[in-house]
Amino acid sequence: LGLPVLCTSFAEAKAALGYSDDFANYDLCEVMYTHFQLFGCQPVILCNMLNPATMKATVTAADINLTDHKALLPIDAINDASLVVKPSTSGSALTKGTDYEAYYSGENLVVEAIEGGSAYSAAKLNIAYNKVDTSKVTKTVVAGGFAAVDSCMSTVGIVPDLLLAPKYSSESEVAAVMATKAGGINGMFGAKALVDLDTATANSYTAAVSTKADKG
């Protein structure tokens, strides 16, 4: 968390940080896809500021139907001690590794009943869990992440020449930190800050210029 991660391929980036097509909530995944899949560029240095240990929300227990002995939870479900699986609302919690396994596959956290376990013949399971709350990644958190720029040389051996913070850089506070950091990395290198403009207001060339001026 908050450390530079050097990636030279789409597969490497996914293995290092995980991946989802939900770009509205997972901005680094959008960078991965755009950088490697759309434009075929490499490398890229990614810095994750989403901490699922603290940036989470509770999902109330609910019955979920099983298909092929599997219950599919959304990708933002967290596979940790908060995952409680029961045969019913009033039943006792099942044992992970004996009655079920939980693992990520595609865009889901899969809860699969184990053959020989007490839930293998169940048609549904009652499941409670915590989920990632991406709304807790605030502009302040993202701005703070740019402190990692100065450690890129010592940790990954490369100094970035372009700084990005998709969506967040449209906030003046984040853009200001990016501009300052781009002006002097490790006291000797320079970079360019690629800052987003909110197209809700910057919807023409003229508006883009005025919005840029307003944001500083």
Give the predicted meaning of each segment:
Residues 1-216:
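Surface-exposed assembly/interface segments
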